[in-house]
């Protein structure tokens, strides 16, 4: 992001506080947003990652008294019309910037001309803009290529692997640092400074009343040129390679989520940092388990006698089976809870929810049939009527 874009940010809104918020309120708001949207808590959630970054950027300014003062003064000046048009098009000395002179007032003075320098105007404008937009001469540096491309791949896991977490090898083919020149692209390992842009990565051009800056055509905006290209990578600093990396999948990952591995994407050009790797997870359906958040759901068949008389049954879990006690008279369809046998979350562990379902035998031998007839007779003699309280009894 160009520093000139800071003026178009609403940092108070990004933190959800008013412009009169105290230092403590700003700190609390930032911590809350950072905790809720942290990438470790929301693996693969791009929206949460964006909110996390916006909150961090806002707190970097509003959490610093000096920066906040500069920011507030700048926003007030823009709101009052002191600078027309805002900074949507940048300013002189910024990529895509402008400068023009009307009525003896040269707006290039406001931005330190085309050199990225400080302000020389009176009235405190240098104090307002100097801190925000001139963090050092040559602010074009921020527009240079800074990292390699991001990479996305996909994997498929079983339900149990996704619920418990696992590590899995992933095969990738992409740009990797050249071992010969150690990613520099140069035989000597040291690219030369571009003479066209003097290492800034940008050149300026005047067209009448306007001045424009653009990425340097000689170096492509990097500020460096390769005068002695590496024989192996031909000056790129990267070569195509196949590699295998081990990806750690966190517990409880859900179907469709993405896991981000910082710095595991393609290598950056000429020694620049690598991009990120995003692993999209697909989870196969399981014959036994389903899930509801961090809870695991299972339906298990039981006999009528087990429900009527009570007893203990063996129930599978993510690890080893456990014994579940059925109270006498448990109704068909009842769901019983086994605490702590679900999916581990950051602050707690879910439960195993077991629903019992009567399995009615299709064929009975003579002894079983006789026993059931005897039971039915005893049931009638005891006065038991399963439809006694049924709403449709008298219809």
Curated annotation (Swiss-Prot):
Q: Where does Zn(2+) 2 bind?
A: 194, 197, 216, 219
> Residue ranges of the CR-type zinc fingers?
165-242
* Protein name, as recorded: Chaperone protein DnaJ 2
Keyword line: Chaperone, Cytoplasm, DNA replication, Metal-binding, Repeat, Stress response, Zinc, Zinc-finger
Q: Which NCBIfam families match?
A: DnaJ_bact, PRK10767.1, PRK14279.1
Q: Which domain of life is it from?
A: Bacteria
Residues annotated as binding Zn(2+) 1: 178, 181, 230, 233
> Where mainly found?
cytoplasm
Single Gene Ontology BP term?
response to heat
Could you tell me where this protein is found in the cell?
Cytoplasm
Subunit structure of this entry? Homodimer.
Key word Cell division present: no
The record places domain J at 10-75
Entries under PROSITE patterns matching the protein: DNAJ_1, DNAJ_2, ZF_CR
Extract the GO molecular function terms from the UniProt entry: ATP binding; heat shock protein binding; unfolded protein binding; zinc ion binding
Q: Which family does it belong to?
A: Belongs to the DnaJ family.
Q: Which cofactor does it need?
A: Zn(2+)
Gene for this chain? dnaJ2
Q: Does the keyword Aminoacyl-tRNA synthetase apply?
A: no
The protein's job, in short, is: Participates actively in the response to hyperosmotic and heat shock by preventing the aggregation of stress-denatured proteins and by disaggregating proteins, also in an autonomous, DnaK-independent fashion. Unfolded proteins bind initially to DnaJ; upon interaction with the DnaJ-bound protein, DnaK hydrolyzes its bound ATP, resulting in the formation of a stable complex. GrpE releases ADP from DnaK; ATP binding to DnaK triggers the release of the substrate protein, thus completing the reaction cycle.
HAMAP family given for it? DnaJ (MF_01152)
């Amino acid at each position: 992001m160009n520093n000139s874009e800071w003026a178009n940010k609403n940092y108070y809104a990004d933190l959800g506080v008013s412009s009169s918020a105290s230092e403590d309120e700003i700190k609390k708001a930032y911590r809350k947003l950072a905790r809720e949207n942290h990438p470790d808590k929301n693996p693969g959630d791009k929206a949460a990652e964006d909110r996390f970054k916006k909150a961090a950027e806002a707190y970097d300014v509003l959490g610093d008294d000096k920066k906040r003062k500069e920011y507030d003064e700048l926003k007030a000046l823009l709101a009052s019309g002191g600078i027309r048009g805002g900074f949507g098009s940048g300013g002189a000395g910024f990529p895509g910037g402008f400068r023009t002179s009307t009525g003896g007032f040269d707006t290039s003075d406001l931005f330190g001309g085309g050199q990225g320098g400080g302000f020389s105007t009176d009235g405190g404008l240098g104090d307002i803009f100097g801190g925000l937009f001139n963090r050092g001469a040559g602010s074009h540096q921020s527009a240079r290529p800074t990292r390699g491309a991001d990479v996305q791949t996909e994997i498929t896991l079983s339900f149990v692997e996704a619920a418990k977490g696992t590590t899995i090898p992933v095969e990738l083919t992409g740009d990797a640092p050249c071992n010969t020149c150690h990613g520099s692209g140069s035989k000597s390992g040291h690219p030369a400074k571009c003479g066209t842009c003097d290492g800034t990565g940008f050149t300026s051009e005047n067209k009448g009343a306007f001045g424009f800056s653009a990425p340097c055509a000689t170096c492509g905006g990097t500020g460096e040129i390769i005068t002695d290209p590496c024989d192996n990578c031909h000056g790129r600093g990267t070569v195509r390679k196949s590699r295998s990396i081990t990806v750690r999948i966190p517990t409880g990952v859900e179907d469709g989520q993405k896991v981000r591995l910082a710095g595991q994407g393609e290598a950056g050009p000429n020694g620049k940092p690598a991009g990120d790797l995003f692993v999209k997870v697909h989870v196969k359906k399981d014959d036994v388990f389903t899930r509801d958040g961090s809870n695991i759901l299972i339906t298990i068949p039981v006999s009528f006698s087990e429900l009527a008389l009570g007893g203990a049954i063996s129930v599978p879990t993510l690890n080893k089976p456990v014994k579940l006690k059925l109270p006498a008279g448990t109704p068909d369809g009842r769901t019983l809870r086994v605490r702590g046998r679900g999916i581990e979350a950051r602050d707690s562990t879910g439960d195993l929810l077991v629903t019992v379902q009567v399995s009615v035998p299709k064929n009975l031998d003579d002894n079983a049939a006789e026993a059931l007839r005897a039971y039915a007779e005893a049931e009638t003699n005891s006065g038991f009527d399963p439809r006694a309280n049924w709403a449709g009894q008298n219809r």
